[in-house]
Amino acid sequence: MEITTTTNDETAIVVLRGRFDAHEAASFRAAVSGLVEEYGLVRIDLSNIAFIDSTALAELVRLSRAAQARGSDFVLTDPSVPVRVILELTGLNLALRIEDREPAPERS
């Protein structure tokens, strides 16, 4: 998985690309550790994630809780269709803040 982080005064944006699974959890954790302490808003862009597993979901929940404990905002941005389906099936779409740049396509 490719991880790109950009920051400004108050916001960290982490763009993920590829598969986010157990094999990538450690590199994700290393890349984002400290962001919730440093920035008031952490955005994780999931628009280019083709696959996500339970270990990756646990990492997102862990980061969300860490941000909440610090009083920071944590947002998942533009989850791809496969990621959105998993978030909805697990109910994490109700527990995590998700924002779309454009309205999500309706599924039939």
Where are the predicted features?
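STAS-like cytosolic regulatory interaction modules
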Residues: 1-52, 62-108
